[in-house]
From Swiss-Prot:
The gene is mnmG. It comes from Aliarcobacter butzleri (strain RM4018). This is tRNA uridine 5-carboxymethylaminomethyl modification enzyme MnmG. Its cofactor is FAD. NAD(+) binds at residues 271-285. PANTHER family: GLUCOSE INHIBITED DIVISION PROTEIN A, PROTEIN MTO1 HOMOLOG, MITOCHONDRIAL. One of its GO terms (biological process) is tRNA wobble uridine modification.
Length: 625
């Protein structure tokens, strides 16, 4: 059978890659080990979070499915960091894991141009030593394709650890992929080993919730997808519960360090720095007398709870003892024990910004195979890989998001230029231009791309453009409207509880005060009071960041100009202060014609580009003399 695109793996990356490909009109085949597990949430029953919510909003703006699925299957919605600025707030939703999986499976089955097939891909078909042309499966079938996208998750040589016990698996009790990473290594790709883990799941009927703190959703929940009707969005919300470990818990754990695979050398791969196991936390933060735990329902039935904050690969007797030492969990019945899993990944610096491998043509990687952690990071990569595979077939320009355009751009740029030796997680602090890259404006930033690729329909893009026009009109009006200290103005400010002004002030700066809310906005800018509250909130946010955004836009224009700078053949990188030997070696080898081309070389950081640009200007000036 012949296909345009074959996607290997039905996780969060594989779903977005295959849907994007099919929706762009390409004959697509999604091959996965278990069709029932398409869209499975292998670890926590939640989507989003700090910076992760940005990724979901961005992939939704381009035409991805994760946001819509979350809105349809979520059982609790919250805005994290709600008391802080909009740039660092993050949307998060608890999901019904079963319904999420069912939704994604149904979408995949009902999408034109997309076929779903259950099997294990055992090998890539390669011609001319460096060109993928299809895959071979365990049932000995061969499928020919123009492009192949690998989204293998934790399945490549997956090895589960629970105490001294270990067994081969891609996920608990699911078969691993045993041959694929060996072939990738033989093809010259650098393959490494990483580790992640998950906590035990508990029977709800055995938990004493009455002694825990209830943690509910927002009163007025906001959907993830820009395409979800906000006025009709009223999901049934279920609470989570908070409890804590204690000194007894820590004593049980620390006295069994000698049995922990993490410390005995049984586990070789590095785990996620920002999501450590409970034994790692107790070891690293010995001075802490407790750690917070969240009990999260896995489905709307609330029969099984996930212990967020207690990931572990300790032996089952130790897991049982430590869980029973926690307040409210004294009689908890364990349905599934926590475990760690090691798996193979491919060094992401082996990739282009399109997520195609540099050494092997037509082969794309997305998700945990690229050393990332998290459903959202995986889904974002899957979307980009799927889009670029299609664009390459059509011989069109690749889709590469800049760091100033999207968190997705930051994610991919970090991976392919800097690389990582531990599971990579997205944070707002990784984005230099985070004031521009807010959740609520993702559609304004990115929907035009989705429409261009046929992933966003005409009606949606029309709404986005109308929204853009309204916001721009409001900001332009406020940026040119002066408020003076006349009697009427002072009385108005006093009536809404705002500090008086002593001199004239631009309305945009007045609205930019932290104390301004929708009510005050309507009083100060009555000509825009008729807009819906979501739009008014966005105008207020734009006003708050107005001055900062102006500064960042100037920085971006400066950066764009810098990237266009040409580099003469006679320019030498040797001896430039601040550049590592590795970077100098790569630059001398590749001889990039422009600074933009230099930025695409792995290991060449933004700081290195600044050094090159500075010395390039000196070189050009001296050459002219």
């Amino acid at each position: 059978m012949n296909y345009d695109v074959i996607v290997v793996g039905g996780g969060h990356a594989g779903i977005e890659a295959s849907l994007a490909s099919a929706r762009m009109g390409k004959k697509t085949l999604l091959i996965t080990m278990l069709v029932e597990q398409i869209g499975a949430a292998s670890c926590n029953p939640a989507i989003g979070g700090l910076a992760k919510g940005h990724l979901v909003r961005e992939l939704d703006a381009i035409g991805g499915e994760m946001g819509l699925c979350t809105d349809n299957t979520g059982i609790q919605f919250r805005i994290l960091n709600a008391s802080k600025g909009a740039a660092v707030q993050g949307s998060r939703a608890q999901i019904d894991m079963d319904k999420y999986r069912e939704y994604m499976r149904k979408v995949c089955h009902n999408t034109p141009n997309l076929e779903v097939y259950q099997d294990e891909v055992t090998a890539l078909l390669v011609k001319n030593d460096n060109e993928v042309c299809g895959v071979k499966t365990k049932l000995t079938e061969e499928f020919i394709a123009k492009k192949v996208v690998l989204t293998t998750g934790t399945f490549m040589r997956g090895l589960v650890h629970i105490g001294e016990n270990k067994y081969e698996a891609g996920r608990a009790w699911e078969l691993p992929s045993t041959t694929l990473s060996t072939q990738l290594k033989e093809l010259g790709l650098r393959v490494g080993r990483l580790k992640t883990g998950t906590p035990s799941r508990l029977d709800a009927n055995s938990i004493d919730f009455s002694v825990m703190d209830m943690h509910g959703g927002d009163v007025n929940p906001a959907p993830f997808s820009f395409r979800t009707n906000k006025s009709d969005f009223a999901p049934t919300q279920f609470p989570c519960y908070i409890t804590y470990t204690n000194e007894k818990t820590h004593e049980i754990i620390s006295s069994n360090f000698y049995r922990a695979p993490l410390f005995t050398g049984q586990i070789e791969g590095l785990g996620p720095r920002y999501c450590p196991s409970i034994e790692d936390k107790v070891n690293r933060f010995a001075e802490r007398d407790r750690h917070q735990l969240f009990l999260e329902p896995q489905t709307a039935m609330c029969t099984e709870y996930y212990i967020n904050g207690m990931s572990s690969s300790l032996p089952i007797d130790v897991q049982k003892a430590m869980i029973h030492s926690v307040k409210g969990l004294e009689n908890a019945k364990i349905i599934r024990y926590g475990y760690a899993i090691e798996y193979d990944y491919v060094d992401p610096t082996e990739l282009k910004h399109t997520l195609e491998t540099k050494k092997i043509k037509n082969l794309y990687h997305a998700g945990q195979i690229n050393a990332t952690t998290g459903y959202e990071e995986a889904a974002a990569q899957g979307l980009i890989a799927g889009i670029n595979a299609c664009l390459s077939i059509d011989e069109k320009e690749p889709f590469i998001l800049r760091r100033d355009e999207a968190y997705i751009g930051v994610l991919i740029d970090d991976l392919v230029t800097k690389g990582t030796n531990e599971p990579y997680r997205m944070f707002t602090s990784r984005a230099e231009y985070r004031l521009l890259l807010r959740e609520e404006n993702a559609d304004l930033r990115l929907s035009q791309y989705g429409h261009k690729f046929g992933l966003i329909d005409d009606e949606t893009i029309k709404k986005v453009e109308n929204k853009r026009k309204t916001i721009e009109e409001a900001i332009e009006f406020m940026a040119n409207e002066w408020m003076t200290s006349k009697k009427e103005t002072l009385e108005l400010l006093e009536s809404i509880g705002e500090e008086k002004i002593n001199d004239r002030v631009l309305l945009v700066d007045l609205i930019g005060r932290n104390s301004i809310d929708i009510f005050k906005f309507e009083k100060l800018v009555p000509s825009f009071a008729h807009l819906d509250n979501y739009l008014k909130e966005q105008i207020i946010i734009e006003a708050k960041y107005y001055r900062y955004i102006q500064k960042q836009q100037k920085q971006i224009e400066k950066m764009k100009k810098m990237l266009k700078a040409t580099i003469p053949e006679s320019f030498s990188y040797k001896g430039l202060p601040g550049l590592s030997n590795e970077v100098v070696e790569k630059l001398e080898k590749h001889r990039p014609p422009t600074i933009f081309n230099a930025s695409l070389i792995s290991g060449v950081t933004p700081a290195a580009l600044d050094i090159i640009h500075l010395n390039l200007n000196i070189f050009v000036t001296n050459t002219k003399k």
